Amino acid sequence: EKLEKKIDNNSAGVIITYLYSTSNHIEKFLSRFKNKITIIEDAAINFGAKSNNKYLGTLADYGFFSFNVVKNLNTLNGGAIYIKDNQLFDEYVSEKKYEKFPIINTINLLLTILILKFFFNNFVYQFFHYFLVLVYKKKINFILKKIYPILYHNYERMIPKSYSYDFNWIMNDVGVYNLKKVKTDYLDRRDKAMLYSQLISDQVATKFDCFSEDNALLEYTIVLKNTDNQKAHAKLMEEGYDIRHTWYINNHLIDGNDDKTNFKDTYFVETKIFCLPVHKNISKKDIQKISNIINTFI
């Protein structure tokens, strides 16, 4: 109802972000606002996810995806845009101008991948963890910016030049290779997410039934009931697990507006949502340990 009241002749569109939405939520929203306003789907972290057998990012007027290093389809960099209207799509393609992806940027990407692979190897991480503890304790921003780029985001006044860079052959080959693994990787993440759901007590967290392909499950998201995500992160860090403590920052704060009336949910999300890892380096034994620690947050 609040959104409907906000829509007027000056409204360009509305962006919907799939965090822990279900197919039911998605279909209700689309049926309610279709043809009332342009709908843009933020499916950045949900490539391959479906609602009623239709891919997220292709349900509304526009959709966009991210194929960055940590996404479920990794091409090292870049993403994709979906445009439903064929005429608008043809116009966009005819006007779009591409620039070659700089070689130095490609080298930097490959070096970043190698560094991440090295430091987050399970064996190396046992030693690297002590360094991370120091980074968090001393708040060494140079390192934290690499771990949590979203917390130190620079808001651009103009479209960055990199938005015009085309894929090069390395990104194409990496994308093709990873595209073949999207389904099997998803099933592995889903199994791990379901294990978290089974092991974590309802007393300490709200959990979501998001196992029906309507979420790509890059992480398993819970809402903490009795503590906040910063305290939960600190406790798990003591036990050897660096769990991402912040999912999304509250952009409302950037405007210097401390009125929480219209944005209660965003304040709640920023402090209470906790993202549990389901990547390849996390074993079932790790999940059991993490869940046992979380169950102490009573």
Where are these regions (language model features)?
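Active-site phosphate-binding strand-loop segment of PLP-dependent enzymes
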Residues: K2-S94, Y98-F101, C275
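PLP-dependent aminotransferase class I/II
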Residues: G13-T17, K28, K50, N86-I298
